[in-house]
Amino acid sequence: MTDAGPGATAVPRAPGNGTGGAPVPSSPVVPSDVPHHRTAGDGWVECACGRRHWGRFGAAGLLLARRDASGVPVAVVLQHRAPWSDQGGTWGLPGGALAPDEDAVTGALREAAEEAGIDPSDVRPTGTSVLRHPDWSYTTVLADEIHPAEPTATDAESVEVRWVPVDEVADLPLLAAFGDAWPDLRRRLGAGPDTADALPGGAPTA
Ligand SMILES: [Zn+2]
């Protein structure tokens, strides 16, 4: 509730983060003074739904949950998107375009490592949720924290990456698609891997 509102895109930089206090660009140009990863899947898809989406081979993101001792999810990792990015200033999942022939789990973990400094060995994927469009798809990879993970913004795509209490997620200005998906994703986190597309190795469902 102390976070900047949706109109506040000029987030002050923390001192001493190595960027020298450069102004936050207001134009949709990737800053050149911060790391930015590229894959062969980077690019827009003109979708038959009438919109365009990022990721020539689809996209994926990581929904990483921290649970309390009784297994109840208490926080998830969210990314505060850089002002220059699509729907800049909103909060969503660390993730991005899949590389050619890259499966969604691999891609989501790769992007989470690149953007949020999340070590894949600290994470256990538990399931996926796929949003299908005519010419594109987005896979949310649900995962549990198995070793303490301290995410941080590690490239140009994030203003901030942090644990957000589950009960506070809906109060943030969310990326539209993530906001639409959040009620179902939250239910799935709470219910555990109870659906048909739970990953092999998850808890038995029958
Ligand atoms: Zn579409």
Which residues make up each language-model segment?
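Alpha-helix boundary/capping residues
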Residues: E111, E115, A176, L185-G192
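Short, surface-exposed secondary-structure junctions/capping segments
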Residues: L98-P100, D171-R186
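Active-site-adjacent beta-strand/loop module that shapes the phosphate/pyrophosphate-binding cleft
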Residues: S129-A156, R162-E168, A181, L185, ...
